Amino acid sequence: VTTMTPTEGRTALIAFVKDTTQQLDITGWWPKSGGAAPDSCGLGGGEKGASYSFDHWAPRGTDPAGDARKVATYWESLGMSVRIADSTPWPRVFGEGGPVLRAAFDTKAGEDTYRVGATARCAPGDAIALLKEDNAQRAAGIVVPGDEGTIPRWDPKKKYTLEPVAPAEPAG
């Protein structure tokens, strides 16, 4: 049973993912999938809740097996139950518990990339309302936690306007 709100869970989730990436000597981590996203989940007894999921991607390192061991050791230090699926040469690390519900580190996530992803524990809340709240903040120009480094996606429903740019004043 969690005592965190979904947004507190998001804060812990983002810190967990970013702290995990810091265990590796890899640069270029970014939220390829977008910001932290809320989802519906079950709290038991038919009660619905909400939790966030979040991931970061980076170019693959040169020592996937060593990097998998580093992530596993770090997650164990956080009190997580950890298992390494040793699909040589691209192991995957799975963790449960600790600061998040579950997490995974994939050394072959796609085009020569690493991926660290996690899901926060389910907490009382409404995922749709949270998403609307997050999107309202984004529309107001507020950077929602986890959005740092995301690339805006083209929205065919949105009307884009090109603003005329005033010519620069000549230097002198």
What is the predicted role of each segment?
Residues 1-19, 85-172:
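An acidic-aromatic pocket/loop used at catalytic or ligand-binding sites
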Residues 1-8, 39-73:
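Terminal, regulation- and interaction-focused segments at domain boundaries
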Residues 8-53, 168-171:
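Compositionally biased P/S/T/G-rich terminal and signal peptide-adjacent segments
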Residues 15-24, 62-83:
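Amphipathic alpha-helical segments
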Residues 27-28, 55, 73, 88, ...:
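Short, low-complexity intrinsically disordered segments
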Residues 28-34, 47-62, 102-117:
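Short, Lys/Arg-enriched charge-dense amphipathic segments
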Residues 28-33, 80-88:
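Surface-exposed patches in mature extracellular/periplasmic domains of secreted proteins
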Residues 39, 76-81, 97-104:
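Short small/polar-residue motifs
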